[in-house]
């Protein structure tokens, strides 16, 4: 991840506030594989019946960048999300929940990719 810009702050704020009762949002989590943009770590110590946890990897292309660049960033995001999912931090954090890996790529202000792996 890089510095926060408008749309990323919006997504991050929504993710953190909407899920805050059940998830501990960990942003820019330092793991052995680098940094995850958002890891919604389930609060299993309080809500032991939780079923889901989330990694969200965000990427940004400039408005003038080609579609090839968007696809390159998409592949990069997928690889990063997969790497983060294999770290001890994430494996411990998700417990028995199902981990959802989500990649989002913006081109300028337009969301061009939003997919669950």
Task: Show which residues each predicted segment covers.
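Single conserved hydrophobic/aromatic residue that forms the stacking wall/gate
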Residues: 1-6, 10-11
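C-terminal accessory domains/tails appended to large, multi-domain proteins
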Residues: 24, 48-53, 59, 67-68, ...
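Conserved catalytic cores of phosphodiester-cleaving nucleases, focusing on short active-site segments
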Residues: 13, 36-40, 51-65, 84
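Flexible loop/turn segments at secondary-structure boundaries
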Residues: 32-37, 45-47, 62-66, 109-113
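A short, contiguous, amphipathic alpha-helix enriched in charged residues
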Residues: 12-18
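Nucleic-acid nuclease catalytic cores
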Residues: 69-115
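Active-site-proximal structural scaffolding
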Residues: 7, 31-32, 49, 70, ...
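Active-site metal-binding core of divalent-cation-utilizing nuclease and nuclease-like domains
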Residues: 19-50
């Amino acid at each position: 991840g890089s510095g926060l810009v408008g749309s990323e702050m919006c997504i991050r704020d929504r993710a953190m506030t909407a899920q805050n009762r059940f998830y501990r949002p960990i942003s820019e989590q330092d793991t052995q594989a680098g940094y995850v943009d958002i890891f919604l770590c389930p609060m299993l110590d309080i809500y032991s019946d939780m079923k889901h946890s989330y990694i969200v990897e965000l990427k940004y292309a400039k408005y003038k960048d080609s579609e090839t660049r968007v696809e390159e960033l998409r592949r990069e995001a997928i690889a990063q999300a997969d790497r983060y999912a294999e770290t001890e931090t994430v494996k411990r954090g998700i417990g028995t929940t199902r981990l959802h890996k989500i990649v989002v790529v913006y081109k300028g202000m337009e969301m061009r990719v939003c997919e669950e792996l």
